[in-house]
C-alpha cells in the first residue's frame, strides 16, 4: 500500500480593496432628499389596517476607521410618527445582510428595536439598503404612549426603510 500526498490549494488572500466588506469606506454618509422611502404599516392579525408613508427628516451612517462598530441614525419627521432610530450594534449576518440593534426614541423614551437591512448595492462611497423592523404595537404603546387613530386596531407594526447613503 502506498501513500499519496495530494497538493493543497492555498486559501485566497484577503481582499485589500474591501470587496468582501458590506459597508463603504470609513467616513460619514448621509441620505440626500428624495433618495429614501419609509413606510409605516399597522397590522391586525394578517390584515394591514393602515399603510402610510413617513417623511425621513435625516439619516446618517458613520463608518469608523478601526474595528469599531458603524452607527446608523434615522430621524422620522411626520405628524403621526415622529421618532429617532439610533443603532447601538451593527452585525453582519449571512447573505449580505446587516442586523441593527438599537433604540427607537418616541416621546423621549427609548424602545428597543431590531432593524434587518439587506445591502442592495455597495460602492466605496455609497451604500443602498432596504430593511424592516417589526415592533409589537401593544408593547410600544404601553412603553412610549405612541397611539394610532382609535379606528385602527393593531397588533403589530412594520417600519419599512429604503435609503441610499452617499
What are these regions (language model features)?
Residues 1-166:
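Low-complexity, acidic/polar, glycine-enriched regions of mature
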Amino acid at each position: 500500500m502506498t501513500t499519496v500526498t495530494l497538493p493543497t490549494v492555498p486559501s485566497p488572500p484577503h481582499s485589500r480593496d474591501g470587496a468582501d466588506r458590506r459597508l463603504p469606506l470609513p467616513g460619514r454618509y448621509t441620505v440626500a432628499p428624495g433618495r429614501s422611502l419609509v413606510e409605516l404599516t399597522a397590522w391586525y392579525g394578517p390584515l394591514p389596517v393602515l399603510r402610510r408613508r413617513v417623511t425621513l427628516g435625516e439619516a446618517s451612517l458613520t463608518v469608523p476607521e478601526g474595528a469599531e462598530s458603524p452607527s446608523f441614525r434615522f430621524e422620522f419627521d411626520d405628524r403621526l410618527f415622529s421618532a429617532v432610530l439610533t443603532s447601538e450594534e451593527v452585525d453582519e449576518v449571512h447573505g449580505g445582510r446587516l442586523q441593527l440593534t438599537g433604540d427607537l426614541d418616541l416621546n423621549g423614551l427609548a424602545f428597543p428595536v431590531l432593524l434587518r437591512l439587506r445591502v442592495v448595492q455597495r460602492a466605496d462611497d455609497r451604500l443602498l439598503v432596504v430593511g424592516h423592523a417589526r415592533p409589537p404595537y401593544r408593547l410600544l404603546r404601553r412603553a412610549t404612549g405612541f397611539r394610532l387613530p382609535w379606528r385602527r386596531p393593531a397588533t403589530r407594526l412594520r417600519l419599512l426603510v429604503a435609503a441610499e447613503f452617499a
